[in-house]
Amino acid sequence: MSKKLSAAFLVLAGALWGCLSIFVSALSDYGFDSKEIGFIRISLCTLMLLVIILIRDRSLLRVQLRDMWMFVGTGIISVTLFSYCYFTTVINVEAGIAASLLYTSPVFVMLFSAVLFRERITAQKIAAIVLTVSGVALVSGMLGSSALGALDLIIGIGAGLFYSLYSIFGVYALRKYSSLTVTFYTFLLGTIGFLFMTNPIAIIEKTASNPVVIPMEIGLALFNGLLPYLFYTIGLGHTDASIAGVLVAVEPLVGCLVGIFVFHESVNPAKLIGIALILSAIVLLNIRLSHKSTAKEIPA
């Protein structure tokens, strides 16, 4: 696959994820909470992808038991917990703020890489952390009178934390398995994770009593679950994880635009500056300094 095509997949994935709040807010209006919405999304994605694999190549379902830790990581630790945190923030706060807090994830990737892979923490990376923290403060309203509650802020940043883990575990999984296999078992384990948090029977009853939500649920699973995860996983398999993080950074921009134009959320200079700082940190983390750079490195 060409680099341009893989880049296009990553950008498209980010754009689709940026529209997530449309379906989340619609289902929330019909009484579904964040955990129920997460279960609907992941379980339907699992069924859709299972049908595709059964038609295309059943051998894609074969994995070794000793590798299941990878899918526990991408599915339960990442997708389940990320979905809960992100949907909760969208419902309780604003779509734009939720999308912006989500993109603290590259900082977590950097920190995990320093601990797990012994990558060095440079002055460049520290500057990115400062930009991110400042951006989060501005976007969340911490520096103004309309500050987020501490719990909302923690949950919003938690979405960024768990989102970052998909890249960490995903890289390991893609070394052995195809993008379809990785995505399917991610969804399957994510569904299992939500079973401990929801009552599927109650969700079915709630859906049956309001059939109008069925197209919303299918749209949520297809356009904000199956397609973007497939696009992202395919792109990640042909692109450096750090570059992938930059390309999908269109998500908070799309998310904020959805918040402003669809939900008529307020916009102010502080929020715009905060978004710009977070995106600047993402770009800064991925600028390749020349070998002649005088940037100081701080051992992790």
Where are these regions (language model features)?
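Glycine-/small-residue-enriched transmembrane alpha-helix faces in small-molecule transporters
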Residues: 1-40, 145-172, 297-300
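Specific transmembrane alpha-helical segments of multi-pass solute transporters/efflux pumps
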Residues: 21, 50-96, 102, 138, ...
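C-terminal transmembrane-helix exit sites in multi-pass transporters
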Residues: 48, 53, 86, 105-130, ...
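Helix-helix packing/entry segments at the starts of transmembrane helices
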Residues: 8, 14, 40, 79, ...
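C-terminal-most transmembrane helix of multi-pass membrane proteins
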Residues: 42, 141, 213, 249-300
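Hydrophobic transmembrane alpha-helices of multi-pass small-molecule transport proteins
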Residues: 49, 121-141, 194, 270-289
